[in-house]
């Protein structure tokens, strides 16, 4: 398992090296384009069942989400399934079982990676580490929390590289400042590091050292704020080498993905799908010969009755 300490060591070994151009993704005779489908959730908040009544009656629930995911996987060759945090808290399931059924459900659905939201500490940092260790068969990725000396120290990674159909996809993650938001007793001595600096450091490593064709950041910062508080909007604008930010925390249902320009004037896409598993985000990327990628299609799919 890659730890933040190992990442920093690897980064030090490569520091100062010349930037080399990325090799062409497609060799002669291969297909001219490839497709990657990214499915994503955020702020599900222990909503394992559909809403029983009210505005979202019949919507959400892990059974309906799993059905949609399986249908998309049957139709598409290269699919990633990601979550941007706040898996826990919000229903009696968490009050009674402290995250066990949520982790089991996500593992059964085949999530490729997730990050950590502030409410994932609501049972305490030891509980979070225990539930990940016992029930999650996918990695939790976060680059700006230093868990040294805490139970989470061996249960997270600063990045993950996934190969899909000849594409090399790098994934990192960032979390929100916990001080003032979460009781200190719940997160212990976890240190919060600058998310823009850490995400950029890891993204640079993934693009230059790991030769990733795309870098995705799972973010629990929140999409944007009225003041200058760090957000996904500012992360997109100030970072380098991140292509896509899966947003969370602010529970916003985006009508469509947002497009920003980063510090190098390259495009960064940001998307968020509300909360409670009411929607499943879908982003379809096409990679052309020469490693040119574009967001081809997007859809926020309503989960539940009639979905």
Over which residues does each language-model region extend?
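Acidic, metal/ion-coordinating pockets
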Residues: 2-304
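Polyanionic/metal-chelating signatures
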Residues: 307
């Amino acid at each position: 398992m890659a730890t933040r300490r190992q990442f920093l060591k690897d980064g030090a070994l490569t520091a100062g090296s010349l930037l080399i151009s990325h090799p062409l993704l497609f060799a002669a005779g291969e297909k001219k384009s490839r497709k990657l489908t990214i499915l994503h959730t955020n702020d599900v908040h222990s909503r394992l069942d559909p809403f029983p009544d009210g505005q979202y009656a019949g919507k959400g629930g892990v059974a309906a989400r799993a059905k949609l995911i399986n249908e998309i996987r049957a139709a598409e060759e290269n699919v990633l399934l990601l979550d941007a945090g706040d898996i826990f808290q919000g229903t009696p399931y968490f009050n009674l079982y402290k995250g066990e059924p949520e982790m089991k459900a996500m593992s059964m659905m085949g999530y490729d990676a997730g990050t950590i939201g502030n409410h994932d500490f609501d049972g305490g940092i030891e509980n979070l580490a225990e539930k990940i260790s016992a029930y999650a068969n996918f990695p939790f990725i976060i680059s700006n929390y230093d868990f040294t000396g805490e139970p989470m120290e061996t249960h997270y990674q600063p990045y993950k590289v996934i190969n899909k159909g000849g594409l090399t996809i790098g994934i990192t993650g960032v979390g929100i400042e916990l001080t003032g938001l979460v009781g200190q007793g719940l997160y212990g001595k976890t240190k919060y590091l600058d998310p823009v600096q850490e995400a950029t450091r890891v993204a640079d490593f993934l693009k230059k050292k790991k030769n990733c064709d795309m870098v995705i950041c799972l973010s629990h910062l929140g999409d944007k704020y009225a003041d200058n508080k760090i957000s996904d909007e500012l992360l997109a604008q100030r970072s380098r080498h991140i292509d896509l930010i899966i947003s969370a925390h602010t529970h916003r249902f985006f009508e469509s993905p947002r497009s920003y320009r980063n510090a190098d004037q390259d495009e960064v896409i940001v998307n968020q799908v509300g909360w409670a598993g009411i929607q499943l985000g879908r982003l379809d990327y096409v990679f052309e010969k020469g490693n040119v990628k574009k967001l081809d299609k997007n859809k926020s799919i309503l989960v539940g009755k009639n979905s």
